[in-house]
Amino acid sequence: MKASETLIVIGREFGSGGRALGRELSKRLSVPFYDKELLHQAAKQFGISLPEFERNDERKPSVLRSMVESAFGMCPANSSNVNSDTLYALQSCVIEKLARQGGAVFVGRTADYVLRNNPRLLSIFVHCDEEGRARRIVKRGDCKTQEEALDMARRNDRLRQSYYNFYTGRQWGNAANYHLCIDLGKLGLQTAVDIVLHATFDLAQRIK
């Protein structure tokens, strides 16, 4: 297998730099990068308004509902009232479809779980100390102060954790659920990129 055929999936704490790592890996391997682009692709493919996906992006349903049977065939075009479970199923369908097209970098959206049985998967969780996360959040203009940034980071982490745990039955951020866990604040972006690339090339050599 070629390294460029690897499916790199990045889970991340809010503000940890996981998206920046994903973009850099995408460039170095010359493979597509999918983050919020997944929502656009899913909305376009299934004829559902983009705001529906954005409202439910990495957010657990407010009430427990069982997955909709035959979800891919039951979604009315341009629906304004599609439930979270159906949207999750459709998004997962898009992730699987994109994975069949070749190597890629996916950020979030439980893609590590969706692709868990794919031998080309390399799953990563990125974390960082709170001070570093706050600095990054302020620098990119999401907040004006570090206090606001920390509040935003913690709030978004809670949302991501509940979403991931709800749909996967796994524990978000638990090292046992990932192939690599990286402290981006300690290692820095370039070192992290080198580590992941090394793992990617090693995985490619071992898969016939």
Predicted features by range, described:
Residues A3-I8, R12, G102:
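Pre-Walker A (Motif I) flank of P-loop NTPase domains
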Residues I10-S26:
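Glycine-rich phosphate-binding P-loop
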Residues P32-A43:
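Short beta-strand-centered segment that lines the nucleotide-binding/catalytic pocket of NTP-utilizing
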Residues A43-G103:
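ATP-dependent small-molecule kinase phosphotransfer cores
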Residues V63-V68, K144-Q190:
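Small-molecule kinase domains that catalyze NTP-dependent phosphoryl transfer to phosphate-bearing small molecules
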Residues S92, L189-L197:
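Short, amphipathic alpha-helical "lid/cap" segments that border enzyme active or binding sites
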Residues S92-G141:
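ATP-dependent NMP and nucleoside kinases share a basic, alpha-helical "lid"
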Residues A204-K208:
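C-terminal helical "lid" subdomain and adjoining coupling/linker elements of P-loop NTPases
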